[in-house]
A protein has these predicted regions:
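Solvent-exposed adhesion/ligand-recognition segments of exported proteins
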Residues: 2-131
Length: 131
């Protein structure tokens, strides 16, 4: 004798809600990742990295510094400020990616500094109209 099993109507609804929650959890960091640089690791010299609202601030304390980044993008309406010791200070920003490879850098927002800032990305760098 075979019996038929029916799935209660609540299960598909729960699955939809779970799928939407997972999608939102994945999309939020991805959107942030496109707006400001992330995954910064100071590998030479002295510098600290902080975030407040739509701005990332790099406070450089030595004449030269190197930061390896997972991703370095500046979205429209966002900004990155480099506070350096003086006008001849130099900072090298290398985009090294993460376990998923390297994405091209896109600068659509503000990038300001009082010294010299270099960005190196082997996948390429694009400056948009709003940069």
């Amino acid at each position: 004798m075979r019996t038929k099993h029916s799935i209660p109507q609540a299960r598909p609804m729960r699955r939809r809600r779970l799928a939407l929650a997972l999608l939102a959890a994945i999309a939020a960091p991805a959107a942030m990742a496109q707006s400001l640089p992330y995954g910064g690791n100071v590998v030479s010299g002295g510098a600290t990295i902080g975030y407040s609202g739509n701005t990332a601030t790099v406070n450089q304390s030595t004449q030269g510094a190197i930061i390896n980044w997972n991703n370095f993008n500046v979205g429209a309406g966002y900004g990155v400020t480099f506070n350096q010791p003086n006008a001849s200070a130099v900072i090298l920003n290398r985009v090294v990616g993460s376990g998923y490879g390297i994405s091209p850098t896109t600068i659509d927002g503000a990038l300001t500094a009082n010294g010299h800032v270099f960005i190196v990305n082997t996948a390429g760098i694009t400056f948009g109209n709003s940069a």
